[in-house]
Amino acid sequence: MRLVYADNNATTRVAPEVLEAMLPYLADEYFNPSSMYEPAQGPARAIAGARRTVARFFGGVRPDEIVFTSCATESNNAAIFGALRANRGRRHVVTTAVEHPAVLNVCRELEREGHEVTYLPVDSSGRLDTVAFVKALRPGETALVSIMHANNETGVIFPVAELARIAKETDPGIVFHTDATQSVTKLPIDLTGEFRHVDLLSFSGHKIHAPKGVGALFVRRGARWRPFLLGGHQEGGRRAGTENVAFIVGLARALELAASTHEEDERRIRLPSACRPRAA
């Protein structure tokens, strides 16, 4: 029996091109990229190249604004706890009631630690009320807004670019984070253009035909944020731990593939719906 897999929003198969790009760093180029000897410089250059690729994908942000992590859950934790560590005078967080558990459970932990969290409801269509969002913001008190870009259960797309703009116009001191795990490669995200008010963005590799066990966090230069995972100097001191070179290379290759096939993929996906008979 032939398996027809229709759950790519849960996880994806590693693309053959991604696996091919990864293999050298699992077999021959296995050196620690932090080491000073010559063989280790290859993996170090591979990470630097991957960082540039990811930066280009998001509209040409600075490569040093990309922090590689182990997954979107780590990225979300790093974004939220890091923003609050850098804004200790503010104790209020705004999020939605329909976030992924990687955000919701962090917010519940924040409440146990004494923070106040506003959970914005959605309507029967899963959409967010922008007016309620504006009312929830508290200038001088709100440290962080964390709102997903696309919901992992309903598929509803939240107007993150607009919400980030509103938050910054209300209070430039508010840090805006979005979990873009379900939207990266499916929707355009230009962090130098429409999404320029977003401070922190997280996503994962296994949703985009890269392997499980790798993700990234965009940290805009100048954003109020402090590192979450402490230890060594890796990732510019923003995420300690020896880098997973092969998986980082795979993540970047997956984004390259997505960028090169986006128009064709969108045409192919939209064609069946365009061909459906319409009611008179």
Please report, for each region that a protein language model flagged, where it lies by residue.
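Pyridoxal 5′-phosphate
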Residues: 1-280
